[in-house]
Regions:
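A short hydrophobic/aromatic micro-motif that marks alpha-helical segments and, especially, helix-coil
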Residues: 24, 87-89, 112-114
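Interdomain hinge/lid region at the active-site interface
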Residues: 39-108
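Internal alpha-helical scaffold of NAD(P)-dependent oxidoreductase catalytic cores
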Residues: 1-56
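Long, positively charged, glycine-interspersed low-complexity recognition regions
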Residues: 111-122
Length: 122
């Protein structure tokens, strides 16, 4: 299937479904790598399915992704800012013990994931 869209819209869509996930995967791997000695080894030893699945794309070509990030920086930074706001809101909910907010966000994530499966995108 071929879709057409305006270039700016394309950049925003790809920023959220491709570029931001790669940036997050590279970053969480970097965070794990920066842990001190024993903790770093334990991260590798005890990495559960979620960490392995989430970070699979961190094995991608660093030069290619550097160029993608820099050539699409405006859309990527816009989506990163939105993500950071959402992550901060989730952090506040965890800190303040807001189970309704946390559950709502998890539920919304499940809906998106199930939609991908139904569309045979997963």
């Amino acid at each position: 299937m071929v879709s057409t869209m305006e270039p700016a819209h394309h950049d925003r869509v790809l920023a959220i479904v491709s570029h931001l996930p790669h940036l997050l995967a590279f970053t969480i791997c970097g965070t794990a790598d920066d842990l001190e000695g024993e903790s770093r080894q334990e991260v590798l030893q005890f990495a559960a399915t979620g960490f392995r699945d989430f970070t699979r794309i961190a094995a991608s070509d660093p030069v290619m992704w550097r160029d993608i990030f820099l050539n699409n920086r405006e859309a990527l930074l816009e989506m990163l800012a939105r993500f950071m706001e959402d992550a901060q809101a989730m952090a506040r909910a965890v800190r303040w013990g807001d189970p309704a907010y946390i559950e709502d966000k998890i539920q919304r994530g499940r809906v998106i994931r199930r939609s991908l499966i139904e569309l045979k995108q997963a």
